[in-house]
Regions:
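Membrane-embedded alpha-helical segments that form the functional core of polytopic membrane enzymes
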Residues: 51-107, 124, 141-150
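C-terminal membrane-associated helical module and adjoining short loops/tails
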Residues: 2-36, 163-303
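Juxtamembrane helix-capping/reentrant segments at transmembrane boundaries
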Residues: 98, 102-115, 176-177, 301-303
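Alpha-helical transmembrane segments of multipass membrane proteins
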Residues: 43, 63-67, 257-259
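Transmembrane helix interruption/hinge and helix-loop junction motifs
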Residues: 70-77, 135-138, 262-271
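Structural signal for membrane-spanning alpha-helices in multi-pass inner-membrane proteins
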Residues: 66-70, 123, 127, 261, ...
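Alpha-helical transmembrane segments
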Residues: 128, 133-134, 138-165
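Select subsegments of transmembrane alpha-helices in polytopic membrane proteins
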Residues: 51-56, 112-120, 241-251
Length: 303
């Protein structure tokens, strides 16, 4: 399909939306929640609307969601859920639009992640306020804080393995496994937009501790699985494991909150998130370690 964009005739290639080439893709449950976005991207493609503007719009939807949760208006949970889903949907339009246009950037990458962080903090505070206000039990602040920390750690867990995989496949180059500021980043900032570096520093401040914790957990698991350094690529290229942990992504977390908000079961959502979803993720890690050790033992026996 041919469009006129900025005075030039350009073709729309839906395949460019994907983060991974066909042969490297795996089943990602998150794609079920926003499958309609390809049509929205197609509509936006020839317009002057930018991916970063979509990110800002997703921020507005997220702020509206948090506001509705604590507003006390009739059907507050329903409206909170509606705007939260709008945030989720738009959050997956901006990146796809950037990839289709070939305008991905480090600025957009950090803006998107920092928007996710801010909205997540506010929404979880709002949900906790609702529980405390409706029950009169301040103990729910502990449950809300545990839910927030769990949400961040599960999402970082998924992203850690996803970026390790995509970096080896050779796609999704705007993300790095370690986003710590390097000498190269400082040098690049001198001749480019300084906001790239500013957002990167802020990103490291809010996400760095999560990345370090997941990195240490992964190192422990590799030791338990007896993975030598020269076989790390195989460890991070397990598509079945990536498919299995995809429900831990922030997107699915938000969809769960949307569903339980519509059901009026915010407490149950937090309990399931903290208990079941953590056990689910740890169970998959245990399975990965056990499978790896079993396969290595088979190879030893064959020799």
């Amino acid at each position: 399909m041919i469009f006129l964009l900025n005075g030039f005739m350009v073709s729309f290639d839906i395949e460019k939306m994907n983060k991974l080439p066909v042969e490297a893709r795996f089943f990602d449950v998150n794609e079920l929640w926003y499958f309609m976005n390809r049509w929205v991207v197609r509509l936006l493609y020839p317009t002057p609307v930018t991916p970063n503007q979509i990110t800002v719009l997703s921020l507005i939807f997220g702020l509206a969601s948090a506001g509705f949760y604590v507003s006390g208006v009739p059907n507050a949970l329903v409206w909170g859920a509606v705007f939260l889903y709008g945030k989720v949907f738009l959050d997956n339009v901006d990146g796809n639009l950037a990839r289709v246009r070939g305008t991905t950037s480090r600025f957009g990458r950090f803006l998107d992640s920092l928007t996710d962080f801010g909205v997540t903090v506010l929404v979880y505070i709002a949900v906790t306020v609702v529980l405390v206000r409706t029950t009169g039990a301040p103990e729910y602040w502990v449950l809300g804080l545990l839910g927030l920390l769990t949400c961040f750690m599960q999402s970082t867990f998924f992203v850690f393995y996803l970026v390790n995989y995509t970096s080896r496949v050779g796609s999704y180059e705007k993300n790095r496994v370690d986003e710590s500021v390097t000498e190269e980043d400082l040098a690049n900032a001198e001749g480019a937009d300084p906001w790239d570096l500013r957002l990167q520093i802020l990103f490291v401040w809010v996400y760095g501790w999560q990345d370090k914790m997941v990195e240490q957990l992964d190192a422990l698991c590799r030791r338990l699985a007896r993975v030598p350094d020269d076989e790390e690529a195989n460890w991070y290229s397990d598509k079945n494991f990536l498919a299995g942990i995809s429900p831990l992504c922030l997107c699915t977390n938000n969809i769960m909150l949307v569903i339980f908000s519509l059901l009026g079961q915010l407490e149950l959502f937090l309990i399931l998130l903290i208990s079941f979803m953590n056990l689910y993720g740890l169970g998959l890690l245990a399975w990965k370690i056990f499978s790896r050790r079993r396969n290595r033992q088979r190879l030893v026996n064959l020799r």
